[in-house]
């Protein structure tokens, strides 16, 4: 898998694994990566099979395996799960939620998350039998109850791709400790402004 690893201090700082969304590539996330560089944190950003220069065809099972491989790669570098933060963006929230279940990660961040792929598809194609036709389910609403790690859910209230109510519902279903950031004017690709960065920094500090 193609990925970028930015190391600051493996001993004293937590490490983020960033799971990106469906659209674009690693290069499209440079604006987020640059903000991570200003924070006392290590980070690994990976591209899925079938994305960027990676070979293969993306599937729910395949992306879970890619996520697991990323965690194992960090484990081999001596980074334990309790020092890893899973950060999922859009589609990547399905992978982060799945992997965080019944595990002891330092924290979980979900940006523009969906309740399930079926719900997300019904929002776009309300008159089709999506639950029958859709192969990949990504049932975040069922899995989030199994997450014991501290969780931060961020969702723009004007999201036109994944409706805001999905992020709000996941927040309601999540176990404590849980935190939210719901800016009123943000769309699907959230603006990495001062308020969002402060929210991330506060969350990171709460994990220490």
Residue map of PLM features:
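Short beta-strand/loop motif that positions the catalytic acidic residue
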Residues: 146-148, 153-159
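Membrane-embedded segments
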Residues: 1-73, 82, 100
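Catalytic histidine neighborhood in serine/cysteine hydrolases
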Residues: 168-189
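Acidic catalytic loop of the alpha/beta-hydrolase fold
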Residues: 157-162, 188-190
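Short alpha-helix in the alpha/beta-hydrolase fold that links the catalytic acid
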Residues: 32, 140, 149, 163-172
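Primarily recognizes the serine-hydrolase "nucleophile elbow" in alpha/beta-hydrolase
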Residues: 73-77, 81-125
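Mobile cap/lid helix-loop segments that gate and shape the active-site cleft of serine hydrolases
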Residues: 106, 113-149
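Post-His helix in hydrolase/transferase enzymes
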Residues: 191-205
């Amino acid at each position: 898998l193609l990925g970028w690893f930015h190391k600051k201090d493996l001993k004293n700082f937590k490490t983020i694994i960033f799971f990106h969304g469906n659209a674009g590539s690693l290069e499209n996330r440079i604006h987020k990566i640059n903000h991570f560089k200003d924070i006392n944190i290590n980070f690994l950003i990976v591209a899925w099979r079938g994305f960027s220069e990676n070979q293969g065809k993306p599937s729910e099972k395949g992306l879970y395996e890619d996520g697991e491989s990323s965690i194992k790669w960090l484990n081999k570098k001596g980074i334990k799960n309790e020092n890893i933060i899973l950060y999922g963006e859009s589609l990547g929230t399905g992978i982060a939620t799945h992997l965080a279940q019944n595990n002891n990660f330092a924290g979980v961040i979900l940006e523009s998350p969906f309740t399930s792929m079926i719900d997300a598809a019904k929002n776009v194609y309300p008159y089709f039998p999506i639950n029958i036709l859709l192969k990949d389910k990504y049932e975040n609403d069922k899995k989030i109850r199994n997450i014991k790690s501290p969780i931060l859910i961020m969702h723009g209230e004007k999201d036109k791709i994944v409706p805001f109510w999905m992020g709000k519902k996941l927040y309601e279903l999540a176990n404590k400790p849980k935190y939210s950031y719901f800016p009123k004017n943000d769309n699907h690709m959230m603006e990495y402004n001062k308020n969002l960065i402060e929210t991330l920094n506060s969350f990171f500090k709460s994990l220490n």
